[in-house]
Amino acid sequence: MKNRLTLYLLLFPLILHAQILKNPIPDKLVVLTFDDAPASQYSVVAPLLQEYDFGGTFFVCEFQPNYADSALYMNWRQIQELDRMGFEVANHTHTHANVSKLSQAEFNKQLSYIEDKCDSLGIPKLTNFAYPGYGLNSQALEFLEAKDYVFARAGGSRAYDPLSDHPYLIPSWATDETNKAEILSAFDQAKDGKIVILTIHGVPDIEHPWVNTPPELFKEYLEYLKVNEFTVISMKELEEYIDVDEAKRLHKPDFSKKLSN
């Protein structure tokens, strides 16, 4: 009996690996995500991503109260153009709502507004979500499951481990103009089956300077990733590596881990 238990403990990580991973996670795998739909994501970010041939996911919302100000935020035609450029458009709620304070009906309304807007513009069905302000709770995960979302991104300033992190609690680092050393150090953690995900706001961010990433710093990150031969993808492309249904089945959501930035 003791020998069987020892054998099971030795084999369990291999079994888990085989069930959750469709393909091995390569070292130097990075996901770039962009929140809140500031105007600079269209004018600065998208052209630079194209220049470097990098993927990315844009989590869009209508950030109240100034979302209609084209000097601050993208309009829906620009968001449509991001999709046409080959980038993923994903859901960040209608009004940048704290989903931990919403009923299921309220949450569904927030999600459906963005879904319907995208559908009207020919943008493919949205499958991924990011928690505005990193506000979340266990109910939010249940609501996302009911709506058939695949991945949901939080914060936490740590690498994503598909063998231990629930697909609705994917951690990320957030960039700003002060944490260059932290972000460069974070890239080093993209190894041994772990994936580094960045949350980026405006480049620059005029309305929310505390999450501002200067364009020259953003380009420096892209250059670092290119020179050091990182693979840079969207959230959606994680499905090439991860069996999400198995990950949901095998991982209980762990709210004791850090989930905000």
Could you tell me what each predicted segment is?
Residues 1-22:
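Bacterial Sec-dependent N-terminal signal peptides
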Residues 20-88, 115-117, 124-131, 224, ...:
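Active-site beta->alpha N-cap acidic-glycine motif
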Residues 20-21, 66, 119, 151-160, ...:
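C-terminal domain-boundary segment and adjacent tail
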Residues 29-33, 56-60, 88-93, 125-131, ...:
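Structural recognition of the beta-strand scaffold that forms the well-ordered cores
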Residues 37-39, 63-65, 94-96, 134-136, ...:
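Short, solvent-exposed loop/turn segments at secondary-structure junctions
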Residues 41-44, 49, 70, 98-185, ...:
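Catalytic domains of cell-wall/extracellular-matrix polysaccharide-remodeling enzymes
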Residues 60-73, 98-104, 207-210:
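Acidic/histidine-rich helix-loop elements
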Residues 71-77, 106-110, 211-217:
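Charged helix-capping and loop-helix junction motifs
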